Amino acid sequence: MIQVSTHLEVADNSGARIVKCIKVLGGSRRKYAALGDVIVVSIKEALPGTKVKKGETARAVVVRTAREYQRSDGSYIKFDGNSAVLINKEKEPIGTRIFGPVARELRAKKFMKIISLAPEVL
């Protein structure tokens, strides 16, 4: 469960390391984002000489959450931390590699490029 001001790790090689959620997309009164939801983030830490810079804003999709997420079959999934992958307006990842596992819920939300780049889908 991600809300405004939540800090997330970045799970790709776009150059950003830490981002902060500044908006949850999908409705004017929406408070929380779960697995597979798109958020607007501000880049707080970035490596020098990369595609994104500190202080820029970007869109990101949540790929891992520390809060457990209940699936339709009744099982739960949770991860050690909150992570996101930076995407462009066309919902394609900015980076060319994804680090760590991602949730299966991304497949239902049509993030196939992220699914194919991920080393493991849980």
From Swiss-Prot:
GO terms for molecular function: large ribosomal subunit rRNA binding; structural constituent of ribosome. Transmembrane segments: none annotated. The keyword Transferase does not apply. It holds the Pfam family Ribosomal_L14. One of its GO terms (biological process) is translation. CDD domains: Ribosomal_uL14. InterPro entries: Ribosomal_uL14, Ribosomal_uL14_bac-type, Ribosomal_uL14_CS, Ribosomal_uL14_sf. Part of the 50S ribosomal subunit. Forms a cluster with proteins L3 and L19. In the 70S ribosome, L14 and L19 interact and together make contacts with the 16S rRNA in bridges B5 and B8. Belongs to the universal ribosomal protein uL14 family. This is Large ribosomal subunit protein uL14. It comes from Sorangium cellulosum (strain So ce56) (Polyangium cellulosum (strain So ce56)). The lineage of its organism: Bacteria, Pseudomonadati, Myxococcota, Polyangia, Polyangiales.
